[in-house]
Structure formats: structure tokens, C-alpha cells
Amino acid sequence: MAPSLPPELAALLAPFCVTHEGPGPNPFPAVSLEGVHALARRLEISPAKSMALCLEHDVWPLRFARNRGVFLAREQRRLLESRAAVIGCGGLGGHVVTLLARAGVGAFTLCDGDAFDESNLNRQILCREAVLGRNKALVARDELAAIAAHADVRVFPAAAGPGNLPEILHGASLVVDCLDSLAARRFVAAAADAAGIPFIHGAVAGDEGFAMLVRPGEKSLEALYPDRAPAFENTFDGGGAQLRAGVPTLTPAAIAVLQAGLALRVLTGKKTTGARLCHLDLAGPMLEVLAL
């Protein structure tokens, strides 16, 4: 047990702790979900705050133990205390939400006005036959409850637009763009810039896709999608490009991994480089990083 933990709390957690030999340089204590809940009840705090308190004393929740070595305890705690706004809960968004939840992000705002249909079954991880016809954001909320019951989740089962974006982005640490409309992306990017939070873009068509971090004040999205560009010729414009090239099973999953990776770097305070576009072509396969 971590020596800095108050004796009363150390005694409470002891029956629920195991010693892990790794990952990381030294053995460390890890506490089970049952222990997290016991501490939450004793202190009358939420399970998320219970896990954050454990991490403050370098006691790792067992559910995050394999993250150690990649994240420091303080970085894992930052994730628990962060809120990710995910706009679009389909092909990209379903993967992004589940990846961030498993990594440890503690709060989400989910926005999507669409319902699942049969054409989504080939690629959208949250789409199952049992949920056809249900709103995507509401299904994502239910999935989060099953993966990470401690997560605080706000849901907007409606399309994002200028009228509701300030409310959607309120309190968010960053926003992840999982949309398929260039016009909607521009609205969300402008709202993120106005709110002073990072915007993580993702787009897919065929075997190819983009992922990009846009920090407040940067104009990378405008550089990638200039107004003068023909909407259906040279850009990943969402609906147009997808109608031409299709959206197979693998591409959304791969681009969502890149988006989630960028989000985790931002949320944990790791060094990030803006004005860089990650272009993935699974037909190669090839990954290139381009300066904008």
C-alpha cells in the first residue's frame, strides 16, 4: 500500500488491493472496483473521485493498471477529471467514445441527431441489430454505462448547430469531430475556437482518412478545406466523398484510434504539434504526417 495514503483509508483499501509488478519500473498497489466503491461510500464521494483520490496517492485502480508506463498517476487522474465532447456517435464517434472511456476519461458530452440503420452495421461499432432505429447518442450513453459506470455523461440527441453548440461544449476539455458534413464541421470548429478548447478533426472515405488536432487560434481546418475548393473533387467532404468511395469496416476504426490518441495527449498535457495532418491509407498501408 502507498505509504502516503492516510492509515484509515489504507486499512479500508487493503483487502481490495493487489501488488502489480508492472508495467512501469517498480511494483505498485492496484485497487479493485469493489475497493473503489468501498472508499466512495466511506467518504461519500463519487466512484470517479474515489479513483482520483487513489491515484493521488499512487494507488492505481485495477481497471487502469495496464495504462501505467504510458501514463503517470497524475496523468491518469487528469483523464478522470476531463470531459470530452464527441460530436457524432456513428462510425468514428462510437470507436472514439469507447476508446476514451476505457483509457479513463471521466466525463462525456455526446451529440448526434441520427438513428442507427442497417447500412451502419458494417462499420459502426455501437450498431447492432437490437438497436436499429435508436438514436446514436442514446445508444452511446448506454454503452458508456456498461463500460464505465462512473463516467458522467450528458446527451444531446440532436444535430449540432450554432443554436446548441455553446451548451454542448460547456465544460468540455476538448471536442472530437466525428461528423460527416463539412458545413457542420465548420460550425463545430468555430464554436470550439470561441470556447478556447482544442478541436480534433477526423474524416474517412474508402480506404483513406484524416485525423488532425486544431488548437484555439489555428486555422488548419480552413487550410484543409478552403472555401474555394470544389466540394466534391479534392477534399474529404464527408457525405460526397463517402458516396463515391464508400466507408468500409476498417477505416473508421483506424482513424478513430488516431483521434483518440490525439485526445489523450491533449488531456494528459503531453506535448502536441498543431497544424499537422495525419493521412492514413489502408490500401498501402501508409501513414504520413503533413504540415499545413
Residue map of PLM features:
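Hydrophobic residues within alpha-helices
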Residues: 96-97, 140, 188
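Oxidoreductase and adenylate-handling cofactor-binding alpha/beta cores
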Residues: 256-271
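Glycine-rich phosphate-binding loop and adjoining beta1-alpha1-beta2 segment
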Residues: 51-52, 110-147
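Ligand-binding beta-strand-loop-alpha-helix segment within the catalytic cores
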Residues: 132-167, 183
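Core catalytic loop region at the nicotinamide-binding pocket of NAD(P)H-dependent oxidoreductases
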Residues: 270-282
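E1/E1-like adenylate-forming module used to activate ubiquitin-like modifiers
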Residues: 2-32, 155, 160-161, 166, ...
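Glycine-rich adenosine-cofactor-binding loop
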Residues: 77-115
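N-terminal charged helix/coil linker that caps or initiates catalytic domains
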Residues: 2-84
